[in-house]
Amino acid sequence: MDSKKELIFKKENIGLGKRKQSIARVFLLPGDGKIIINKTSGNKYLQYNDNYLNTVWSPLEKLNLEKQFDIVALVQGGGLTGQAQAIQLGVARLLCTMDKENRSILKPFGFLTRDSRIKERKKYGLRKARKAPQYSKR
């Protein structure tokens, strides 16, 4: 466990996760299972929504490490769903840098896959990206 603690406190050991417009920088610290997002409690930041909290915790739960680490995340941009999923990706990537065996456990669950879907741009002549104004024959 000492070697893992050394890995955690290195400055370059940051898990980076992105989803839609959200970017999350994640740190794992030895602790008892707290979440701190942008210097506030994770429960408060994610508006006490269990879905968001489960999303953030899921990589640690698959490895049975949820009571051994605290998650500290700095998140920018997007909404709460995108931010929670960005934190999840950052946590999963950080766990893989800590121990190479974690990769084979997390990969089948899709925790290491970056969801590349982003908002399509609005085109001129249309109301939204694909919504056209109502067609009138006469």
UniProtKB/Swiss-Prot annotation:
InterPro entries: Ribosomal_Su5_D2-typ_SF, Ribosomal_uS9, Ribosomal_uS9_bac/plastid, Ribosomal_uS9_CS, Ribsml_uS5_D2-typ_fold_subgr
GO-annotated molecular function: RNA binding; structural constituent of ribosome
Compartment(s) of residence: Plastid, Chloroplast
Entry keyword set: Chloroplast, Plastid, Ribonucleoprotein, Ribosomal protein
Pfam families linked to this entry: Ribosomal_S9
Gene Ontology process terms (BP): translation
GO cellular component, one term: chloroplast
Main location class: plastid
Assigned protein family: Belongs to the universal ribosomal protein uS9 family.
Listed name of the protein: Small ribosomal subunit protein uS9c
Gene: rps9
